[in-house]
């Protein structure tokens, strides 16, 4: 795999260039909210240890650019705060068993003026079944476990989407053998300034499974 060049400049310049590289239109208000989100993540991280990533530049790449890379593919069809900022007409619910993470999401919903964003402090398997168009995971579980735990929250005709690193061939084989869900497509992602493999795994119920 060839190296991905870094993006020079300050956070605002790097964000603008990353959006251009992703062909993702982001107005001034959206960009301001995205930068405030990263600033608040840095502040909360000093006290609550939300993420092991400490370097502000790497936080920009691995938490912001990485999440932005899924916005356009999902619209053709991370996550969380970033999706709510970039797509105000989507209703986004973040589910996490770690209370400090859901508290942070709620704080961001208020601080950034995101009425379309909410957080549920629970485990996905403990939620009452929802009727979601899309359920997306990032660094969560194997494809089979993800489908087993989250599949009941997807409406008929809806989609499960897993954000992965390199294509997980063993997980795909295990999922297909189980028979309830099938991989519809695998979409490679290019994250600006990140020299690592990323892909989206799109899954739908197998015919006859509702």
From Swiss-Prot:
Q: What is its main location?
A: cytoplasm
Q: Which Pfam families match?
A: GidB (PF02527)
Q: EC number(s) of the enzyme?
A: 2.1.1.170
Q: Which UniProt keywords apply?
A: Cytoplasm, Methyltransferase, rRNA processing, S-adenosyl-L-methionine, Transferase
Single Gene Ontology MF annotation: rRNA (guanine-N7-)-methyltransferase activity
- The answer to keyword Transferase applying to this record is yes
* Residues at which S-adenosyl-L-methionine binds: 78, 124-125, 138
* Gene3D superfamilies documented for this protein: Vaccinia Virus protein VP39
* Reaction catalyzed: guanosine(527) in 16S rRNA + S-adenosyl-L-methionine = N(7)-methylguanosine(527) in 16S rRNA + S-adenosyl-L-homocysteine
What's the superkingdom here?
A: Bacteria
Task: Tell me a GO cellular component.
Answer: cytosol
**Where in the cell does this protein reside?**
Cytoplasm
- Which family does the entry's similarity section mention? Belongs to the methyltransferase superfamily. RNA methyltransferase RsmG family.
Q: Which HAMAP family match?
A: 16SrRNA_methyltr_G (MF_00074)
What does the function comment of this entry state?
Specifically methylates the N7 position of guanine in position 527 of 16S rRNA.
User: What is the name of the protein in this document?
Assistant: Ribosomal RNA small subunit methyltransferase G
Q: Which gene encodes it?
A: rsmG
């Amino acid at each position: 795999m060839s190296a991905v060049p870094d993006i020079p400049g300050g956070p605002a310049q790097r964000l603008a260039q990353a959006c251009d590289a992703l062909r993702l239109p982001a107005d001034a208000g959206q960009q301001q909210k995205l930068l405030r989100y990263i600033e608040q993540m840095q502040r909360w991280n000093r006290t609550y240890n939300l993420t092991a990533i400490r370097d502000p530049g790497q936080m920009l790449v691995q938490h912001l650019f990485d999440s932005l890379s899924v916005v356009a593919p999902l619209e053709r069809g991370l996550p969380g705060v970033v999706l709510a900022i970039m797509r105000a007409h989507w209703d986004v619910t973040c589910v996490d068993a770690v209370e400090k993470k859901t508290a942070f999401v709620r704080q961001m919903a208020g601080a950034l003026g995101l009425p379309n964003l909410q957080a549920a402090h629970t485990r996905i398997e403990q939620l009452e079944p929802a009727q979601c168009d899309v359920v997306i995971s990032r660094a969560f579980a194997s494809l089979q476990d993800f489908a087993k735990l989250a599949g009941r929250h997807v409406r008929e005709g809806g989609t499960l989407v897993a954000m992965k690193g390199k294509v997980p061939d063993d997980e795909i084989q295990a999922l297909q053998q189980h028979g309830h869900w099938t991989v519809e497509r695998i979409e490679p992602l290019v994250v600006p300034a990140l020299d690592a493999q990323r892909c989206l795994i799109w899954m739908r119920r197998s015919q006859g499974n509702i």
